[in-house]
């Protein structure tokens, strides 16, 4: 915090107020580019040099994630190992330390709710004390804890994990999916984030990419990515709105598409509004009804709650296509009178009534986005729906009422974001040359000045990359250092906005208040990540940082997490190798026993007994498979296979010789018969 005392760092005060017209001329010095020149700079900035190999596009979603790659001029969504085009963003840790990701993790959530993490994207880049985090703590079965840096982390089996780590485990699954398809290592990626993510959340997402072993070339906004997916093959110029209501976040972006240039005019949203909230609202309704009917409170039973949570999600999805659904959960819980079953009918109208306030919360951001973009609903040529929640008929009707037109269904709401990320990857790799993306910063950026006022340097919806400087001065006589507090938000007082970070400029020569000239420069890169510098114009002394909040992951944290992720990857590889070897061994045992039964009359008894001993040894090895390597199991299985092949070869030879013997004796008898007939 900037102190007003002489000894400590003082609050900055705008130089224009203390130095008259001269200082005023220093204010608001943009990087001085015309619009056309800016576009040329942006084109250059958006084309990365010497990118080798494919660039994968990843939609790291709250509920589900998706990965796509460019094939020529078309983006292709890839199927994971389970054959699905989207992967649940769920990570679980079993009692024996095994890590599960995706559908395997989701499937065991009912029996392991305390160690199964879902929707952790809502925690990424957030402090433990944030009101949203405190609200989440009451709604999830797993433990959210305060990390040593004040951030919100999660805990499983006594181990702490940052939300970036959990995101990295999901990204590793996406990376593996891409590598299985490509047939080689996937290193470069474009990852999407909600448009309304602040700097801390964007930085934490980049950290997740780094932990997973990816080189994150660009972090782009989800609605912008969806617009790329929609508009890549469109030739006409138009203004579009992208309404993105996903699993955990809501974004609205207004874009202008003109001859391959995708220019974001404004963006708005709510980073704590999505399908998870709809599930939670329905869950509360079900629990309340169950308590009214049975007198049993389910909120103390995590396993029962997890079953209700899954049933609520399923019912929500079914009501998008049906007007009524049944929720049946037998043996949900029990009391002294015996087991209790849940059986409930739910209509679409009832569900809409339960979540109507959540849907209404999307209206104000849409109106604000249109106002900021200076467009009316009649100017918008198309409304694109993105995110699974936009399948809900009531949401679609709300969008239609809001924009005065039926929304387009031209893109797949689950896949459009990953497709757009892959297209941006193609742009960065130089494979897609006729597309330019001009995005914006979603929130205003500035510093705390005298009296705790938030002084904005860069307003929201400014096109990025961008750079802006402003000159400030000291607030006290003889002040030798100033503390720069960097904030992001729209409130008038700095304390009401998100504190991104702070740093101190020292060594200012003592002078009366208002005399020193301190130039503060904000530079936002194409990822939307903030770089700040402060320079004493009198001495030339400069201090600069890439903003990292007082929380966030340090370089050492990230390096340790990268090592842990590599360790997990190695463990996963060994586990897979062992499972494959066990499957091979069990197959060989089955085949051997089947053949022994089939050829028992042709096989020597002593050789059979030897082979049975080999099978017994193999079974003993498989009984302790968790402590054996895949290579040991494979070698033992191969040895058994070789022994069985030799034995069955003997059986085949014996059978063949018996057939030949019976065939020749049959021929001799035939000749004797012919002789008798002639006589």
UniProtKB/Swiss-Prot annotation:
GO terms for biological process: calcium import into the mitochondrion; chaperone cofactor-dependent protein refolding; erythrocyte differentiation; inner mitochondrial membrane organization; intracellular protein transport; iron-sulfur cluster assembly; negative regulation of apoptotic process; negative regulation of erythrocyte differentiation. Its EC number is 3.6.4.10. Residues 656-679 are annotated as: Disordered. GO terms for molecular function: ATP binding; ATP hydrolysis activity; ATP-dependent protein folding chaperone; heat shock protein binding; protein folding chaperone; RNA binding; ubiquitin protein ligase binding; unfolded protein binding. Residues 1-46 form a transit peptide. The modification Phosphothreonine is found at residue 87. It is an enzyme of class 3 (hydrolase). Residues 63-431 are annotated as: Nucleotide-binding domain (NBD). Mitochondrial chaperone that plays a key role in mitochondrial protein import, folding, and assembly. Plays an essential role in the protein quality control system, the correct folding of proteins, the re-folding of misfolded proteins, and the targeting of proteins for subsequent degradation. These processes are achieved through cycles of ATP binding, ATP hydrolysis, and ADP release, mediated by co-chaperones. In mitochondria, it associates with the TIM (translocase of the inner membrane) protein complex to assist in the import and folding of mitochondrial proteins. NCBIfam families: PRK00290.1, PRK05183.1, prok_dnaK. The N-terminal nucleotide binding domain (NBD) is responsible for binding and hydrolyzing ATP. The C-terminal substrate-binding domain (SBD) binds to the client/substrate proteins. The two domains are allosterically coupled so that, when ATP is bound to the NBD, the SBD binds relatively weakly to clients. When ADP is bound in the NBD, a conformational change enhances the affinity of the SBD for client proteins. This is Stress-70 protein, mitochondrial.
């Amino acid at each position: 915090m900037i102190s007003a005392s002489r000894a400590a760092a003082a609050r900055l005060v705008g130089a224009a107020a203390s130095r008259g017209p001269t200082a005023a001329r220093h204010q608001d010095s943009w990087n001085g580019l015309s619009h056309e020149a800016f576009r040329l700079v942006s084109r250059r900035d958006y084309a990365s040099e010497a990118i080798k190999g494919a660039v994968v596009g990843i939609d790291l979603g709250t509920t589900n994630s998706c990965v796509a790659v460019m094939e020529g001029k078309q983006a292709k969504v890839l199927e994971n190992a389970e054959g699905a085009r989207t992967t649940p963003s769920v990570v679980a840790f079993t009692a024996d330390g095994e890590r599960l990701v995706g559908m395997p993790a989701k499937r065991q959530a009912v029996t392991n709710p305390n160690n199964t993490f879902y929707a952790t994207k809502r925690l990424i880049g957030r402090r433990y004390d944030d009101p949203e985090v405190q609200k989440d703590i009451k709604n999830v079965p797993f433990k959210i804890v305060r990390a040593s840096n004040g951030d919100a982390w999660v805990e499983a089996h006594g181990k702490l994990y940052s939300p970036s780590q959990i995101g990295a485990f999901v990204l590793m699954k996406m990376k593996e999916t891409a590598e299985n398809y490509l047939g080689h290592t996937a290193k470069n990626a474009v990852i999407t984030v909600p448009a309304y993510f602040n700097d801390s959340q964007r930085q934490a997402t980049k950290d997740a990419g780094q932990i997973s072993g990816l080189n994150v070339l660009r972090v782009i906004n989800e609605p912008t990515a969806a617009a790329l997916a929609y508009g890549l093959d469109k030739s006409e110029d138009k203004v579009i709105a992208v309404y993105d209501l996903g699993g955990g976040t809501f974004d609205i972006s207004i874009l202008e598409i003109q001859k391959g240039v995708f220019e974001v005019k404004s963006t708005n949203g709510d980073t704590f509004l999505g399908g998870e909230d709809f599930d939670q609202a329905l869950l509360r309704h079900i629990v309340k009804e169950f308590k009214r009917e049975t007198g049993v409170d389910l909120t103390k039973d995590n396993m029962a709650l997890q079953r209700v949570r899954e049933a609520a999600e399923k019912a929500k999805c079914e009501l998008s296509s049906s007007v009524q659904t049944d929720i049946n959960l037998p043996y949900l819980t029990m009391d002294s009178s015996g087991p209790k079953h849940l059986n409930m009918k739910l209509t679409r109208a009832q569900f809409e009534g339960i979540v109507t306030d959540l849907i209404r919360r999307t209206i104000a951001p849409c109106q604000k986005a249109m106002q900021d973009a200076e467009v009316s609903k009649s100017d918008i040529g198309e409304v694109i729906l993105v995110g699974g929640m936009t399948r809900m008929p009531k949401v679609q009707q709300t969008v239609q009422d809001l924009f005065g037109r039926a929304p387009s269904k031209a893109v797949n709401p689950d896949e459009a974001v990953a497709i757009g990320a892959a297209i941006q990857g193609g742009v960065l790799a130089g494979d897609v040359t006729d597309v330019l993306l001009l995005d914006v910063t979603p929130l205003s950026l500035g510093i705390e000045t005298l009296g705790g006022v938030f002084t904005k340097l860069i307003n929201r919806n400014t096109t990025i990359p961008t750079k802006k400087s402003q000159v400030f001065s000291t607030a006290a006589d003889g002040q030798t250092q100033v503390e720069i507090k960097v904030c992001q938000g729209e409130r008038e007082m700095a304390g009401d906005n998100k504190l991104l970070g702070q740093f101190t400029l020292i060594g200012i020569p003592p002078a009366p208040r208002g005399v020193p000239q301190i130039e503060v420069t904000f530079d936002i890169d194409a990822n939307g990540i903030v770089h700040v510098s402060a320079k004493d114009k009198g001495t030339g002394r400069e201090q600069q940082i890439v903003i990292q909040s007082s929380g966030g992951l340090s370089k050492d944290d990230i390096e340790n997490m990268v090592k842990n992720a590599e360790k997990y990857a190695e463990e996963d590889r060994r586990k897979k190798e062992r499972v494959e070897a066990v499957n091979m061994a069990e197959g060989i045992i089955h085949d051997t026993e089947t053949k022994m039964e089939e050829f028992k009359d042709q096989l020597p008894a002593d050789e059979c007994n030897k082979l049975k001993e080999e099978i017994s040894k193999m079974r003993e090895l498989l009984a302790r498979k968790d402590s054996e390597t895949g290579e040991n199991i494979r070698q033992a299985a191969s040895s058994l296979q070789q022994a069985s092949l030799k034995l069955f070869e003997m059986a085949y030879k014996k059978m063949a010789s018996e057939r030949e013997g019976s065939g020749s004796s049959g021929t001799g008898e035939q000749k004797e018969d012919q002789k008798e007939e002639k006589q």
